[in-house]
Amino acid sequence: LGGNKPVEPAKREPFQARTSIDPRISVLLRDRLIDLSNLQPQQRGFAFEKFLTELFEINGLMPRASFRLVGEQIDGSFELSSETYLLEAKWTNTPIGVSDLHSFQGKIEQKAAWSRGIFISESGFSEEGLKAFGRGKKIICMDGLDLYEMLDRNIAFADVVSRKVRRAAESGNPFVRVRDIF
């Protein structure tokens, strides 16, 4: 722009997820996760989404908070290893069943072919729901105990997702517990 010197493209550091988190931050996040249970249900749901966005930010995953598209809401998204994950987050009184899993799968199928999903349910998933949901989907699942164990043991979120994705690719099972892969 004016002059003989060519314009240099802006330099951007390559995206890198954190492989470790300060143990003090993990403890604070773990305690905040526990404190969410004291909130009223609707307030707790929004607070849980905000908590997850902060967790993704701390882990260097370039999160996006919840957003609306025509006819649907996505609870958030993040990037990991050049993959975009769409988030479904629920904090309910009972484990998640097949209808919620299929509903989220439908959202993923309406996006780009390379889209992936992560369904984080504080209350877990029913065995019947997981069996009926089937195998070979582009969704992995986490429950509240997974989050607690990850934070309590100071395991980076990226490592948890990577191992869950690998296990899902190898077995077809969308849900494997953190304690079974670490």
Annotate each language-model stretch with its function.
Residues 1-182:
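Mixed-charge (Asp/Glu-Lys/Arg
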